[in-house]
């Protein structure tokens, strides 16, 4: 074995003589010493992976990003032989370098276990020529389970590593799915409390009931009179309130986040795109080195950013297709280079995408700017001040990896109905947006590469919208009657996550104005105003 220095990092290269000491799936290992993270708004703000996960959001308001994207450095062909746990370790160990092998494998084992209803964790279903990456087999039947099942373990391990003795307060804004997944992940986890804010009239009936029936002595769920952007902006203001941060610290608390602004949410999402490539290899749908295209229904930009990071690691991804609903601020950005949230806000049947401020786009903007923290901070200040910013032509030229499209409400419903009638496969509303966008993009571009469409939620989570799309006759039925009928026509059992809330009592009924969020946090923590 020999070591090669590279930009201050240690690259470990194994010779053939060393191969006998390694499992075949772990050859070509790259060990990185002190892989650091820095804020997108201040390059001098550098922390370790575990510190970034603990903090959630940088104190300067920026998001933590790795100083470099590590190469996967595994022969692509081996991915077809690896299970989800093995792929997760291969990815996480390259990003979270201050965690030991034992710590990471403990987190992975604890996260991806019987909470998922299939040993495969993430099945891939082929329908009408497309591969649907089913990310909804976890405890709350949405893709957020993929990262939020492991985040509590990463965070509590990080607290021990950094000798953090304060109680961690998880603040989360949700457009529907993150909230329940975070609550399920952190409920009754020692040393933590979790507060979730959601738009009272901006989530589905099932999403709301999943949250307001959540058990756990350390959980708090609060509806706000406003939309998701109001909730997310309110959480960011709380994070940036130095006086409140000091008050909490003196009371024995520290803030962190379960939103995808936390790098501990984002990195685990990279795993399933790497895994998807391996599954297509195993199925013989492509050969090692051949590309796959990826389509992601997109709101806060974290899920598609994870696919972009997978590509940067070396996974052969062709186009990254960003699918929007009628809140098409991202589609317009990719078309024009102008990000402008000054527009009407639409409540749609794909509520997890009803977002006009896509927080994770900042991580991409930072990369497009050549990792110029000052330039990025200026653009984000413009967004805060005027609601818009425009990137340079040089930055736009770096967006060639991406394509964009959007679906109206009518087009989304038609996609659900058409695919069901053609194949019997039922999509949720968000995945239907992605499926429609890809179908239109395919008609114009005639791709030869296979496509992976991120299927982000179970149709049972949006049964009313799904069933109404399939046939208008279902419009008058009660919510759980619709769920039972969906189970019948799709020939799929009602998920446990839905059965559990059928008769569950409401435990959280507080609704507030956005200006009352800080006081609500202090009240839950027992701190006087």
Describe the residue ranges of each PLM region.
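PLP-dependent amino-acid enzyme catalytic core
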Residues: 8, 12-16, 21-529
């Amino acid at each position: 074995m020999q070591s090669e220095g590279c930009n201050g990092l240690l690259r470990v290269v194994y010779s053939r003589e060393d191969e006998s000491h390694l499992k075949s799936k772990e050859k070509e290992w790259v060990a990185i010493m002190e892989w650091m993270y820095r804020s997108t708004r201040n390059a001098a703000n550098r922390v370790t992976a575990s510190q970034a996960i603990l903090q959630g959001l940088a104190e300067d308001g920026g998001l933590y990003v790795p100083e470099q994207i590590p190469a996967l450095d595994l022969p692509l062909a081996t991915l077809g032989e690896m299970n989800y746990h093995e792929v997760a370790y291969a990815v996480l160990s390259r990003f979270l370098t201050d965690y030991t092998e034992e710590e990471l494998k403990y987190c992975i084992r604890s996260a991806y276990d019987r909470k998922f209803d299939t040993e495969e964790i993430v099945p891939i279903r082929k329908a009408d020529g497309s591969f649907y990456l089913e990310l909804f087999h976890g405890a709350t039947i949405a893709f957020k389970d993929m990262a939020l099942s492991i985040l509590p373990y990463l965070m509590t391990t990080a607290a021990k590593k950094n000798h953090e003795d304060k109680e961690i307060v998880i603040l989360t804004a949700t457009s529907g799915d993150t909230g329940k997944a975070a609550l399920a992940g952190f409920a009754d986890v020692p040393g933590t409390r979790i507060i979730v804010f959601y738009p009272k009239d901006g989530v589905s009936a099932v999403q709301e009931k999943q949250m307001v029936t959540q058990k756990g002595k350390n959980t708090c769920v609060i509806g706000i009179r406003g939309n998701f952007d109001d909730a997310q902006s309110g959480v960011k203001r709380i994070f940036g309130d130095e006086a409140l941060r000091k008050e909490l610290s003196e009371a024995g608390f520290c803030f962190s986040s379960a939103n995808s602004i936390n790098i501990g949410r984002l990195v685990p999402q990279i795993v399933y795109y790497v895994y998807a490539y391996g599954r297509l290899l195993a199925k013989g749908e492509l050969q090692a080195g051949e590309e796959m295209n990826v389509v992601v229904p997109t709101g806060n930009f974290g899920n598609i950013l994870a696919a972009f990071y997978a590509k940067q690691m070396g996974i052969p991804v062709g186009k990254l297709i960003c699918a929007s609903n009628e809140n098409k601020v991202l589609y317009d950005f990719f078309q024009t280079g102008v990000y402008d949230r000054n527009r009407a806000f639409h409540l749609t049947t794909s509520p997890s995408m009803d977002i006009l401020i896509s927080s994770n786009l900042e991580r991409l903007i930072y990369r497009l700017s050549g990792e110029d923290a000052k330039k990025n901070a200026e653009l984000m200040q413009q967004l805060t001040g005027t609601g818009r910013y425009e990137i340079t032509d040089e930055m736009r030229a770096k967006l060639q990896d991406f394509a964009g499209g959007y679906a109206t409400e009518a087009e989304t419903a038609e996609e659900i109905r058409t695919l069901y009638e053609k194949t019997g496969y039922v999509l949720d509303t968000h995945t239907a947006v992605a499926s429609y966008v890809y179908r239109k993009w395919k008609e114009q571009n005639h791709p030869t590469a296979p496509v992976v469409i991120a299927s982000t939620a179970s149709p049972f989570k949006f049964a009313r919208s799904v069933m109404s799309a399939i046939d208008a006759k279902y419009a008058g039925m009660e919510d759980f009657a619709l769920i039972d009928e969906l189970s019948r026509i799709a020939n799929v059992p009602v998920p446990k996550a839905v059965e559990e809330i059928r008769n569950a009592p409401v435990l959280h009924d507080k609704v507030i104005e956005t200006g009352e969020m800080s006081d609500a946090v202090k009240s839950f923590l027992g701190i006087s105003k």
